[in-house]
């Protein structure tokens, strides 16, 4: 039932863009495996072998730590409505630092230079494999809307509050692996 591809085909891109949520999975050789849900509105397919997403401030920063240590990253979309399908993007990921030249360029090119409140970095994936599978066991869900709590929280924090939060909560993974913020907020 599963099929493998060397790159993202046009119909894969269309499938990704129709979804409401995607999941990212990362790990190091040691420690826990991380799996996180993300809003597809933050994800951009920029070529047959490249995607990235705008990553918002959260209670942890596992993906960034894992990418620094190992680089492996998998993104997955599932059809929760319409015809069943699961699509996985495999490859090597990297962190694009907040407010770096590359970050600013990608923000301008793919988000109209409009930054979501709480944005902390971008996660880039060089795709070296695509897999689709049937998804016939994935349940159907009715979409009822986006949550706005994180954006409202970030707006309330302001830049200084977000920086303080990241310095406390986003410097290392739960297994103690450093993130890009470890150097930025070094004591």
Residue map of PLM features:
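Binding-site signature for planar aromatic cofactors or substrates
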Residues: 1-187
């Amino acid at each position: 039932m599963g099929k493998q591809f060397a790159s993202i085909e046009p119909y894969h891109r269309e499938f990704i863009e129709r979804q409401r949520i995607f999941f990212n999975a990362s790990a190091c050789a040691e420690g826990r495996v991380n799996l996180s849900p993300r809003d597809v509105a933050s994800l951009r397919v920029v070529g047959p072998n490249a995607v990235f997403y705008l990553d918002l401030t959260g209670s942890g920063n596992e993906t960034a730590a894992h990418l620094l240590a190992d680089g492996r990253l998998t993104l997955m979309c599932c059809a929760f409505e319409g015809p069943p399908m699961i699509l996985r993007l495999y490859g090597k990921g990297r962190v694009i630092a907040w407010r770096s030249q590359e970050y600013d360029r990608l923000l301008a090119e793919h988000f109209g230079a409009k930054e979501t409140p709480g944005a902390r970095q971008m996660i880039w994936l060089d795709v070296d494999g695509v897999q689709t599978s049937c998804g016939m066991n994935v349940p159907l869900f009715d979409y009822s809307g986006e949550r706005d709590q994180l954006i409202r929280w970030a707006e309330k924090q302001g830049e200084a509050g977000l920086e303080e939060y990241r310095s406390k909560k986003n410097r290392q993974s739960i297994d103690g692996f450093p993130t890009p913020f470890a150097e930025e907020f070094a004591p």
